[in-house]
Amino acid sequence: MNSIIITRAGTHSTIQDFGRFQYQHLGVSPSGAMDQRIITELQKIIPNHQNQFLEFAYVGPSIKVKEGSVKICVGGNCNMSIQKNNNSQLECQPYKSINLFAGDELIIHNTIDSVYGYIAFEHGLGLEPCLNSYSTDTKAGIGSINRPLNDEDIFHISKDVSSWDLISIPKPDLEKVTNFKV
């Protein structure tokens, strides 16, 4: 079993996906990622069929692998590093897949020139959907965990890193706004 622990939750870190649009007629907010362009780009690097993403604002979370291994990718312009199990520290870049192993910790310091950043996990976070979506609406208390993340939250990921190939794409030009969510 693979598991991660949130060692620092960051600013308003929540679980999001592309949104729940089938319940708006009942007054349920669609929620979903604030910047869907970024999670669309992350899907190209880390196919995440459950569409579960960790969204954070300004100050990102720190995530430590408790057991096993996990393949992730961070989206958005962020300062981040990896504290390896042997206490060495590696700088890393967004839009590149990263293999983390037991004891490794991803530290996202902050976003740069943007509000939101995202983390994609290769096999999702092992969560159950709520109203056919993983998105969190903190005001309504709806979502897979129906609240922002807290320090010491643990997620169990069902599979090991499936391939050792590290994948990257050119940093997307997100300045071109074609459509956006209000």
Question: Residue ranges of each PLM-predicted region?
Answer:
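Conserved "landmark" site that anchors the functional core of diverse proteins
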Residues: 1-182
